[in-house]
Amino acid sequence: MSFEESLRLSIAVGLTIFLVLLRFDSERIMRSDYFRYRYPWLGPVSYYGLVIAFAIGIVFILPNGRGHLFLTPAEPGTMLPLLLGFAVVGILNAIGFAFRWYGGITPLPTTLLPSRLLGAAASAVADELQFRSIVLGLLIFAGIPGGVTAAVVVQAVLYGVAQRRLLRERQWYFLIGSVLLGYACGWVTITANSVVPAMVAHFLVITSLFAFAGGRLRQRPI
């Protein structure tokens, strides 16, 4: 690795650390009293805007940023099978969760669907951009010991640890589910050589919970 590449990698790693710390503090940013009593929508917009700004900076700094960070179209023939598999697993998980914890299916009220679907889409894109694109891509580019498998595991665990609310409230089901989701989406990204299928898959998992257990989860964001 040349000096210029090493310098670019160091800067990209620094920005990535800030990006991950931003994810750790995302709930406080989006629910800040400063925004809540003025423009409630400004908190989420500020957070997602910062994520995109950091991501753009890292893409431009890292050599061949789009390629190394999986910001390319999916390999032909990979997206549909991967998404179908995620849809099936997401639906089965949501049904099992609904019956295990709530005794039956309780869908999200239709009046709440537009805002929740928009939030789910934004969350899926931001999380996958942060962890499956940037963190995973940088770990692989840096050549950490253990190779691709270690990179997938590390980013999945880091993604789980970033769920501060789940840790604080000891919601072990969702915490373990977050790590498993991060691990699965990591391999989806590697398989498709693109983060796009992981974004869609993440969105499918969240919307499955809305469809089968959203009526009881509506007071708590997923």
Describe each model-derived feature in a short phrase:
Residues 6-14, 42-50, 80-84, 88, ...:
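Alpha-helical transmembrane segments of integral membrane proteins
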